[in-house]
């Protein structure tokens, strides 16, 4: 995961740690395709026929390559009145707290990806529940989706990307140590819904 300003983005290129926030935002927003993935020839950006925006077009085979937003999927795991958070073992935001989440992989649904990330980062056994938040991080081309999840037991076994995994009551949440805006907003919405006694699905734009 990385952060651009106060926004949240997952798994930036390795060189990102050396970039300014503005440079990093440009790098992630436009992942320039230099060569055609189909044939290896040079790709150039222009507006193809019957389109309305620039695409990477192969100069040899004519293949048009699309660059689309990335899905980040995670959970809000709950045990009783407590919520599970993981403390990051990797840069950036090393040592800060986050909900278990990461890139969706090919061949899985958003819920399957969120479950996988929860197991990988926290070693938690959960039952997946409804989709809770959909947060569009427009500036960096990502969509973050968090599901509510009921923990089946209190066993935790953090993976290599987590220093530790811990359960927090609402008044114990380390708000000033949360890694990403999407995590903070999701937690705020979760506790608001819990106080009302009903959970919805929330959508918002960030950046």
State the predicted function of each range.
Residues 188-196:
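A short, amphipathic alpha-helical segment
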Residues 158-189:
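NUDIX/MutT-family hydrolases
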Residues 2-92, 103-120, 124-155, 196-207:
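N-terminal leader/linker segments that precede catalytic domains of diphosphate-processing enzymes
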């Amino acid at each position: 995961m990385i952060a651009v300003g106060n926004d949240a983005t997952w798994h930036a290129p390795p060189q990102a740690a050396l970039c300014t926030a503005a440079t990093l935002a440009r790098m992630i927003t436009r992942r320039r395709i230099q060569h055609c993935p189909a044939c290896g020839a040079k790709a150039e950006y222009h507006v193809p026929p019957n389109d309305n925006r620039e695409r990477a077009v192969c100069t040899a085979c004519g293949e048009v390559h699309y660059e689309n937003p990335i899905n980040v999927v995670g959970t809000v795991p709950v045990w009783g009145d407590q919520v599970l958070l993981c403390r990051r073992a990797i840069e950036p935001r090393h040592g800060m707290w986050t909900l278990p989440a990461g890139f969706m992989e090919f061949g899985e649904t958003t819920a399957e990806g969120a479950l996988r990330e929860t197991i990988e980062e926290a070693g938690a056994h959960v039952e997946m529940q409804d989709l809770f938040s959909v947060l569009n991080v427009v500036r960096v081309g990502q969509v973050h989706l968090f599901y509510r999840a009921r923990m089946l037991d209190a066993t935790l076994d953090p993976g290599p990307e987590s220093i530790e995994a811990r359960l927090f009551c609402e008044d114990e949440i380390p708000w000033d140590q949360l890694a990403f805006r999407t995590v903070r907003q999701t937690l705020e919405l979760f506790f608001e819904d819990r106080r009302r006694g009903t959970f919805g699905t929330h959508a918002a734009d960030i950046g």
